[in-house]
Amino acid sequence: MQQYKHDFIEFALSRNVLKFGEFTLKSGRQSPYFFNAGLFNTGRDLAKLGEYYAKAIQASQIDYDVLFGPAYKGIPIATTVAVALANQFDVDKPCCFNRKEVKDHGEGGNLIGSPLKGRVLLVDDVITAGTAIRESMEIIQANNATLAGVMIALNRKEKGKSELSAIQEVERDYGCQVFSIIDFDDLVSFLERSAQYTDYLPKMREYREKYGIK
């Protein structure tokens, strides 16, 4: 596991964004862990979050022209990622996000920031059902742009209603790759190396066996 992945897990744990225990998900599944990126909610937290996204984007070597953050959660993520890329890697990329409600006055339209054109890297926290991606694709296509890829914080790597995960369905439907700062296997690797959290390993392995993608 790359060092930035390990550091991101520790960062998420320190902010209670990542928790191990027993949790009931919206799907009704009993999960041995929970991830809520909304708890990265201070200036310092958001700055660090942007740095981890930037490191993962650079590591992915994805070719893109513009960052796009889908409303609402993707908006602060895209903003802090754009700043981190410029500050850390001298990569100065334009940034764009959408409104949920279309304005008919002022600058109008449903996009704020740079024009949405060329190869678009969509940034968000997680992909649960893929709904936000599908809505974003409509916006990207309406602007004659192309989805270059997606970067999220966590890939749960678990099956949805079919044998595929929501992420695999997105990759299949739109012919793009979904990258993540960390995934479920990284969490397991972290637990295997951490004396503090080893008690959670059996439940995590059991969950992967039951719901993990093959």
Swiss-Prot record:
Listed name of the protein: Orotate phosphoribosyltransferase
InterPro entries: OPRT, Or_phspho_trans_dom, PRibTrfase_dom, PRTase-like
Pfam families per record: Pribosyltran
Organism: Glaesserella parasuis serovar 5 (strain SH0165) (Haemophilus parasuis)
Residues annotated for orotate binding in this entry: 34-35, 128, 156
Binding locations of 5-phospho-alpha-D-ribose 1-diphosphate: 26, 72-73, 99-100, 103, 105, 124-132
Molecular function (Gene Ontology), one example: magnesium ion binding
Organism ancestry: Bacteria, Pseudomonadati, Pseudomonadota, Gammaproteobacteria, Pasteurellales
Highest taxon, organism lineage: Bacteria
